[in-house]
């Protein structure tokens, strides 16, 4: 059996804002990793509870930083700027890693020639008391072949940020989280990463994602507006080749994503997708007509072609 020789340093970054209720469980799950070449960075984003007291109780088992409040993206960026690892792994202060999370993903990298791939997986949802609710397994809905298409999982909202193992080099090549985005800083950056990087889906469930009351305090309207801007922005940036890569054709991609937007209440993005679909259809029809005219000119000449066009217009006039 081939021995695992690739054992890079992995930086687990835990951004925290008023997370005293759950952060000890998160830190303990990071410390319990079976893969030992890790550093654990806790970034206190201006908390006003007992976050600092809890973090300091771990001593030199973790790297602890305090900063003024700037949002999750800001705290993650602070950690990234101070990390030493070749790979980045995000752990929310209210979530948990399975003990083999990092080891399992490094084992995957050992089997791959491309060490700059982004690895992701499914996850388990838990409640406030850590009771299991249900499992989210993308491979129950889609084939691995599709889940390994770089932008496919992102544009189907299948990626949980804490499942990812990301090569640190991508932050140097592409940049950090947009700190002006309160709700969508993660998907905004994943989109940039996945346009240039390969992705690998693993069927294992390796994290527990907690659902609790404190997560519902954000203003729903503000969230919706930011997500609308995110999805609409993706549509405007995607190339024809990327749409074809994801769904086989631009028309199929736009049709499917329009359904996704409508189902999730992103009405502005839904309308944009429909408009782009109509534009593609009209554009394709115009291209067809132009080709037919050129063919007719070459075969029959200008006079006959004009007659054919006039006849077609009269026939199709309402």
Swiss-Prot record:
This is Uncharacterized glycosyltransferase RT0329. The keyword Glycosyltransferase applies. GO terms for molecular function: hexosyltransferase activity. Keywords: Glycosyltransferase, Transferase. Its EC number is 2.4.-.-. Belongs to the glycosyltransferase 2 family. GO terms for biological process: biosynthetic process. SUPFAM superfamilies: Nucleotide-diphospho-sugar transferases. Pfam families: Glycos_transf_2 (PF00535).
